[in-house]
Protein backbone atom coordinates (compact mmCIF):
# COMPACT_ATOMS: atom_id res chain seq x y z
CA UNK A 1 0.00 0.00 0.00
CA UNK A 2 1.08 3.58 -0.59
CA UNK A 3 -0.29 7.10 -0.19
CA UNK A 4 -1.68 9.31 -2.93
CA UNK A 5 -3.81 12.43 -3.23
CA UNK A 6 -7.07 11.24 -4.76
CA UNK A 7 -9.69 13.59 -6.19
CA UNK A 8 -13.26 12.29 -6.28
CA UNK A 9 -16.30 13.94 -7.85
CA UNK A 10 -19.87 13.80 -6.63
CA UNK A 11 -21.91 13.13 -9.75
CA UNK A 12 -25.06 14.76 -8.38
CA UNK A 13 -23.58 18.03 -7.14
CA UNK A 14 -20.60 18.11 -9.51
CA UNK A 15 -18.35 19.07 -6.60
CA UNK A 16 -14.89 17.58 -6.19
CA UNK A 17 -13.05 16.66 -3.02
CA UNK A 18 -9.34 15.88 -2.63
CA UNK A 19 -7.92 13.74 0.18
CA UNK A 20 -4.86 11.60 0.88
CA UNK A 21 -5.80 7.92 0.58
CA UNK A 22 -4.06 4.57 0.57
CA UNK A 23 -3.85 2.73 -2.74
CA UNK A 24 -2.34 -0.52 -3.97
CA UNK A 25 -0.25 -1.15 -7.08
CA UNK A 26 -3.27 -2.79 -8.72
CA UNK A 27 -5.10 0.55 -8.52
CA UNK A 28 -2.55 2.22 -10.80
CA UNK A 29 -3.15 2.51 -14.55
CA UNK A 30 -1.18 0.27 -16.88
CA UNK A 31 2.32 1.52 -17.73
CA UNK A 32 5.68 0.28 -18.94
CA UNK A 33 7.63 1.79 -16.06
CA UNK A 34 6.83 1.83 -12.34
CA UNK A 35 8.45 4.73 -10.51
CA UNK A 36 8.88 5.21 -6.78
CA UNK A 37 8.06 8.91 -6.68
CA UNK A 38 10.21 11.08 -4.43
CA UNK A 39 9.11 14.63 -5.22
CA UNK A 40 6.44 16.49 -7.15
CA UNK A 41 5.49 20.16 -7.37
CA UNK A 42 2.55 22.54 -7.81
CA UNK A 43 1.77 24.29 -11.09
CA UNK A 44 -1.27 26.29 -12.20
CA UNK A 45 -2.67 23.23 -13.99
CA UNK A 46 -2.30 21.26 -10.76
CA UNK A 47 -4.52 23.78 -9.03
CA UNK A 48 -7.18 23.21 -11.67
CA UNK A 49 -6.91 19.43 -11.40
CA UNK A 50 -6.97 19.39 -7.59
CA UNK A 51 -10.07 21.57 -7.63
CA UNK A 52 -12.97 21.58 -10.07
CA UNK A 53 -10.86 20.22 -12.92
CA UNK A 54 -10.99 23.19 -15.24
CA UNK A 55 -12.06 20.88 -18.05
CA UNK A 56 -8.75 19.02 -17.84
CA UNK A 57 -9.90 16.00 -15.82
CA UNK A 58 -12.55 13.86 -17.47
CA UNK A 59 -12.55 10.72 -15.32
CA UNK A 60 -12.72 10.30 -11.54
CA UNK A 61 -11.35 9.19 -9.14
CA UNK A 62 -8.15 10.89 -10.24
CA UNK A 63 -4.59 11.38 -8.98
CA UNK A 64 -3.27 14.82 -10.05
CA UNK A 65 0.33 16.00 -10.30
CA UNK A 66 1.68 16.94 -13.73
CA UNK A 67 5.32 16.51 -12.66
CA UNK A 68 7.32 14.01 -10.67
CA UNK A 69 10.85 12.76 -10.12
CA UNK A 70 11.92 9.49 -8.58
CA UNK A 71 13.55 6.09 -9.00
CA UNK A 72 12.56 3.33 -11.40
CA UNK A 73 11.32 0.21 -9.58
CA UNK A 74 10.28 -1.93 -12.55
CA UNK A 75 10.49 -1.48 -16.30
CA UNK A 76 9.48 -3.48 -19.36
CA UNK A 77 11.31 -0.96 -21.57
CA UNK A 78 15.01 -1.48 -22.21
CA UNK A 79 15.74 2.25 -21.89
CA UNK A 80 15.16 2.17 -18.14
CA UNK A 81 16.17 -0.24 -15.42
CA UNK A 82 15.53 -0.43 -11.65
CA UNK A 83 17.53 2.21 -9.82
CA UNK A 84 17.51 4.77 -12.64
CA UNK A 85 16.60 8.31 -11.60
CA UNK A 86 13.96 9.83 -13.88
CA UNK A 87 11.90 12.98 -14.39
CA UNK A 88 8.46 13.39 -15.92
CA UNK A 89 6.77 16.59 -17.08
CA UNK A 90 3.92 16.99 -19.53
CA UNK A 91 2.19 14.43 -21.76
CA UNK A 92 -1.09 15.23 -19.93
CA UNK A 93 0.04 13.20 -16.94
CA UNK A 94 -1.89 14.49 -13.93
CA UNK A 95 -4.73 15.51 -16.28
CA UNK A 96 -5.77 12.61 -18.52
CA UNK A 97 -3.47 10.12 -16.79
CA UNK A 98 -2.79 9.57 -13.09
CA UNK A 99 0.08 11.75 -11.96
CA UNK A 100 2.76 12.46 -9.43
CA UNK A 101 0.83 13.18 -6.22
CA UNK A 102 1.46 9.60 -5.25
CA UNK A 103 4.26 7.50 -3.83
CA UNK A 104 4.06 5.21 -6.88
CA UNK A 105 3.37 5.90 -10.56
CA UNK A 106 2.95 3.73 -13.66
CA UNK A 107 3.73 5.56 -16.91
CA UNK A 108 4.86 5.08 -20.49
CA UNK A 109 8.62 5.00 -20.99
CA UNK A 110 8.34 7.63 -23.74
CA UNK A 111 7.15 10.16 -21.17
CA UNK A 112 10.29 9.96 -19.03
CA UNK A 113 13.71 11.57 -19.32
CA UNK A 114 16.79 10.63 -17.31
CA UNK A 115 17.49 12.90 -14.36
CA UNK A 116 19.90 15.53 -15.73
CA UNK A 117 23.48 15.33 -14.51
CA UNK A 118 24.04 17.95 -11.84
CA UNK A 119 20.49 17.85 -10.43
CA UNK A 120 18.93 15.68 -7.74
CA UNK A 121 15.24 14.75 -7.73
CA UNK A 122 14.32 17.52 -5.30
CA UNK A 123 16.00 20.16 -7.46
CA UNK A 124 14.37 18.72 -10.57
CA UNK A 125 10.96 19.28 -9.00
CA UNK A 126 11.90 22.74 -7.85
CA UNK A 127 12.26 23.29 -11.59
CA UNK A 128 9.27 21.19 -12.70
CA UNK A 129 7.00 22.14 -15.57
CA UNK A 130 7.21 25.82 -14.61
CA UNK A 131 10.99 25.94 -14.83
CA UNK A 132 11.08 23.67 -17.87
CA UNK A 133 8.65 26.04 -19.60
CA UNK A 134 10.74 29.05 -18.58
CA UNK A 135 13.82 27.47 -20.14
CA UNK A 136 11.93 26.70 -23.35
CA UNK A 137 10.86 30.35 -23.47
CA UNK A 138 14.42 31.62 -23.04
CA UNK A 139 15.64 29.19 -25.70
CA UNK A 140 12.94 30.40 -28.11
CA UNK A 141 13.93 34.03 -27.57
CA UNK A 142 17.58 33.12 -28.17
CA UNK A 143 16.65 31.19 -31.31
CA UNK A 144 15.00 34.38 -32.58
CA UNK A 145 18.14 36.41 -32.09
CA UNK A 146 17.96 37.77 -28.54
CA UNK A 147 21.29 38.50 -26.88
CA UNK A 148 22.11 40.45 -23.68
CA UNK A 149 23.28 43.46 -25.67
CA UNK A 150 19.87 44.09 -27.20
CA UNK A 151 18.33 45.66 -24.11
CA UNK A 152 16.04 44.82 -21.18
CA UNK A 153 13.89 41.69 -21.12
CA UNK A 154 10.47 41.85 -19.48
CA UNK A 155 9.16 38.96 -17.38
CA UNK A 156 5.47 39.12 -16.47
CA UNK A 157 4.04 37.21 -13.52
CA UNK A 158 7.61 37.27 -12.30
CA UNK A 159 7.01 36.07 -8.73
CA UNK A 160 5.24 32.92 -9.92
CA UNK A 161 6.88 29.65 -10.86
CA UNK A 162 7.64 30.31 -14.53
CA UNK A 163 8.52 33.93 -13.88
CA UNK A 164 10.87 33.18 -10.99
CA UNK A 165 12.90 30.66 -12.97
CA UNK A 166 12.92 32.83 -16.10
CA UNK A 167 14.17 35.79 -14.07
CA UNK A 168 16.98 33.76 -12.50
CA UNK A 169 18.08 32.20 -15.81
CA UNK A 170 18.01 35.45 -17.76
CA UNK A 171 19.94 37.30 -15.06
CA UNK A 172 22.54 34.52 -14.94
CA UNK A 173 22.95 34.78 -18.72
CA UNK A 174 23.70 38.49 -18.41
CA UNK A 175 20.37 40.04 -19.35
CA UNK A 176 18.88 43.13 -17.76
CA UNK A 177 15.60 41.78 -16.35
CA UNK A 178 12.50 43.87 -15.67
CA UNK A 179 10.13 41.88 -13.44
CA UNK A 180 6.40 42.59 -13.40
CA UNK A 181 4.51 41.83 -10.20
CA UNK A 182 1.23 42.76 -8.60
CA UNK A 183 2.62 42.06 -5.14
CA UNK A 184 4.96 44.83 -3.93
CA UNK A 185 6.15 42.60 -1.08
CA UNK A 186 7.88 40.33 -3.63
CA UNK A 187 10.27 43.06 -4.82
CA UNK A 188 13.16 41.95 -2.60
CA UNK A 189 12.63 38.33 -3.64
CA UNK A 190 12.73 39.25 -7.34
CA UNK A 191 15.80 41.41 -6.85
CA UNK A 192 17.53 38.48 -5.15
CA UNK A 193 16.84 36.39 -8.26
CA UNK A 194 18.57 39.00 -10.41
CA UNK A 195 15.86 41.43 -11.50
CA UNK A 196 17.27 44.91 -12.08
CA UNK A 197 13.91 46.64 -12.38
CA UNK A 198 10.56 46.03 -10.68
CA UNK A 199 7.49 47.00 -12.71
CA UNK A 200 4.15 47.33 -10.92
CA UNK A 201 1.45 45.27 -12.60
CA UNK A 202 -0.95 48.22 -12.71
CA UNK A 203 1.52 50.15 -14.87
CA UNK A 204 1.25 47.65 -17.67
CA UNK A 205 -2.02 45.78 -17.15
CA UNK A 206 -4.22 48.14 -19.11
CA UNK A 207 -6.18 47.79 -22.31
CA UNK A 208 -4.22 48.99 -25.33
CA UNK A 209 -4.71 52.72 -25.85
CA UNK A 210 -2.39 53.03 -28.85
CA UNK A 211 -1.28 50.10 -31.01
CA UNK A 212 2.34 51.25 -30.73
CA UNK A 213 4.11 52.87 -27.79
CA UNK A 214 7.76 53.68 -27.21
CA UNK A 215 10.13 50.80 -27.96
CA UNK A 216 11.26 49.49 -24.56
CA UNK A 217 11.71 45.72 -24.40
CA UNK A 218 14.19 43.59 -26.35
CA UNK A 219 12.33 40.43 -25.34
CA UNK A 220 9.60 39.19 -23.04
CA UNK A 221 8.61 36.01 -21.22
CA UNK A 222 4.87 36.42 -20.66
CA UNK A 223 3.04 34.22 -18.17
CA UNK A 224 -0.06 36.42 -17.96
CA UNK A 225 -1.67 36.85 -21.38
CA UNK A 226 -4.80 38.97 -21.71
CA UNK A 227 -4.63 42.75 -21.62
CA UNK A 228 -1.07 42.74 -20.31
CA UNK A 229 0.26 40.77 -23.26
CA UNK A 230 -1.61 43.06 -25.65
CA UNK A 231 -0.02 46.10 -24.02
CA UNK A 232 3.46 44.58 -24.05
CA UNK A 233 3.29 43.83 -27.78
CA UNK A 234 3.06 47.56 -28.46
CA UNK A 235 6.15 48.24 -26.33
CA UNK A 236 8.50 45.75 -27.99
CA UNK A 237 11.56 46.90 -29.89
CA UNK A 238 11.75 46.41 -33.65
CA UNK A 239 12.06 42.71 -34.50
CA UNK A 240 11.80 41.66 -30.85
CA UNK A 241 10.01 38.54 -29.65
CA UNK A 242 7.52 37.68 -26.90
CA UNK A 243 7.40 34.10 -25.62
CA UNK A 244 3.84 33.42 -24.45
CA UNK A 245 3.74 30.75 -21.75
CA UNK A 246 0.59 31.33 -19.69
CA UNK A 247 -2.85 32.85 -19.26
CA UNK A 248 -3.05 33.86 -15.61
CA UNK A 249 -4.55 37.17 -16.76
CA UNK A 250 -6.98 35.64 -19.24
CA UNK A 251 -7.08 33.74 -22.51
CA UNK A 252 -8.21 36.71 -24.57
CA UNK A 253 -5.84 38.95 -26.51
CA UNK A 254 -7.35 42.42 -27.05
CA UNK A 255 -4.58 43.55 -29.41
CA UNK A 256 -4.10 44.78 -32.97
CA UNK A 257 -1.81 43.39 -35.67
CA UNK A 258 0.07 46.71 -35.91
CA UNK A 259 3.10 45.61 -33.78
CA UNK A 260 3.54 42.62 -36.10
CA UNK A 261 3.19 44.63 -39.30
CA UNK A 262 5.10 47.81 -38.45
CA UNK A 263 7.72 46.54 -36.01
CA UNK A 264 8.11 42.93 -37.05
CA UNK A 265 7.34 41.77 -33.51
CA UNK A 266 7.20 37.99 -33.06
CA UNK A 267 4.70 36.26 -30.76
CA UNK A 268 6.08 32.81 -29.92
CA UNK A 269 3.83 30.16 -28.41
CA UNK A 270 5.54 27.92 -25.86
CA UNK A 271 4.11 24.45 -25.23
CA UNK A 272 5.84 22.24 -22.68
CA UNK A 273 3.40 19.32 -22.75
CA UNK A 274 4.16 17.64 -26.09
CA UNK A 275 7.81 18.65 -26.56
CA UNK A 276 9.87 16.05 -28.46
CA UNK A 277 12.42 14.04 -26.51
CA UNK A 278 15.46 15.78 -28.04
CA UNK A 279 14.12 19.23 -27.09
CA UNK A 280 13.43 18.00 -23.57
CA UNK A 281 17.00 16.82 -23.15
CA UNK A 282 18.34 20.09 -24.54
CA UNK A 283 16.19 22.15 -22.16
CA UNK A 284 17.10 20.07 -19.09
CA UNK A 285 20.80 20.28 -19.96
CA UNK A 286 20.48 24.06 -20.19
CA UNK A 287 18.63 24.18 -16.87
CA UNK A 288 21.42 22.27 -15.13
CA UNK A 289 23.95 24.67 -16.63
CA UNK A 290 22.20 28.06 -16.62
CA UNK A 291 19.99 28.05 -13.51
CA UNK A 292 22.08 28.88 -10.42
CA UNK A 293 21.27 26.37 -7.69
CA UNK A 294 21.44 29.00 -4.94
CA UNK A 295 18.74 30.98 -6.75
CA UNK A 296 16.67 27.82 -7.15
CA UNK A 297 16.95 27.06 -3.43
CA UNK A 298 15.70 30.55 -2.64
CA UNK A 299 12.49 29.81 -4.57
CA UNK A 300 11.61 26.57 -2.77
CA UNK A 301 8.66 26.17 -0.43
CA UNK A 302 8.42 22.62 0.99
CA UNK A 303 5.09 20.80 1.17
CA UNK A 304 3.52 17.37 1.73
CA UNK A 305 0.60 15.54 0.11
CA UNK A 306 -1.77 16.78 2.81
CA UNK A 307 -0.88 20.41 1.98
CA UNK A 308 -1.98 20.09 -1.63
CA UNK A 309 -5.70 20.93 -1.45
CA UNK A 310 -4.89 24.31 0.09
CA UNK A 311 -1.96 24.96 -2.23
CA UNK A 312 -4.08 24.13 -5.25
CA UNK A 313 -6.56 26.82 -4.28
CA UNK A 314 -3.79 29.30 -3.50
CA UNK A 315 -2.02 28.97 -6.84
CA UNK A 316 -5.25 29.67 -8.73
CA UNK A 317 -5.52 32.92 -6.75
CA UNK A 318 -1.95 33.93 -7.60
CA UNK A 319 -0.88 33.55 -3.97
CA UNK A 320 2.01 31.10 -4.40
CA UNK A 321 5.48 32.61 -4.63
CA UNK A 322 8.33 30.72 -6.25
CA UNK A 323 8.29 26.93 -6.43
CA UNK A 324 6.54 24.44 -4.18
CA UNK A 325 8.39 21.12 -3.78
CA UNK A 326 6.17 18.29 -2.57
CA UNK A 327 7.86 15.48 -0.64
CA UNK A 328 5.34 12.71 -1.31
CA UNK A 329 6.92 10.48 1.34
CA UNK A 330 6.84 12.99 4.20
Curated annotation (Swiss-Prot):
The lineage of its organism: Bacteria, Pseudomonadati, Pseudomonadota, Alphaproteobacteria, Rhodobacterales. SMART domains: PKS_ER (SM00829). PANTHER family: ACRYLYL-COA REDUCTASE ACUI-RELATED, SHORT-CHAIN DEHYDROGENASE/REDUCTASE. Transmembrane segments: none annotated. The gene is acuI. Keywords: Cytoplasm, NADP, Oxidoreductase. The keyword RNA-binding does not apply. Homodimer. Probably catalyzes the NADPH-dependent reduction of acrylyl-CoA to propanoyl-CoA. Restores acrylate resistance when expressed in an E.coli strain K12 acuI deletion. Induction: By dimethylsulfoniopropionate (DMSP) and acrylate. The keyword NADP applies. It comes from Ruegeria pomeroyi (strain ATCC 700808 / DSM 15171 / DSS-3) (Silicibacter pomeroyi). CDD domains: MDR_yhdh. NCBIfam families: oxido_YhdH. Belongs to the zinc-containing alcohol dehydrogenase family. Acrylyl-CoA reductase subfamily. This is Acrylyl-CoA reductase AcuI. NADP(+) binds at residues 44, 159-162, 181-183, 201, 247, 272. Disruption phenotype: 25-fold increased sensitivity to acrylate, growth is strongly inhibited by 20 mM dimethylsulfoniopropionate (DMSP).
Amino acid sequence: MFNALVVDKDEESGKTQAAVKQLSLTDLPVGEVTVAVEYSTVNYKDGLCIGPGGGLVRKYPHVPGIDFAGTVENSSDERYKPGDKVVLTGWRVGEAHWGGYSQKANVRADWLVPLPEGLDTRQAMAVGTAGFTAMLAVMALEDHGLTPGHGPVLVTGAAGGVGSVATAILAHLGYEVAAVTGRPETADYLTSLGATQIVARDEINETVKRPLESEIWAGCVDAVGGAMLARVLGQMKYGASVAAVGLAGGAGLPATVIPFLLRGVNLLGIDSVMQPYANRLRAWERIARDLPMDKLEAMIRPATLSDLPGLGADILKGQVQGRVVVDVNA
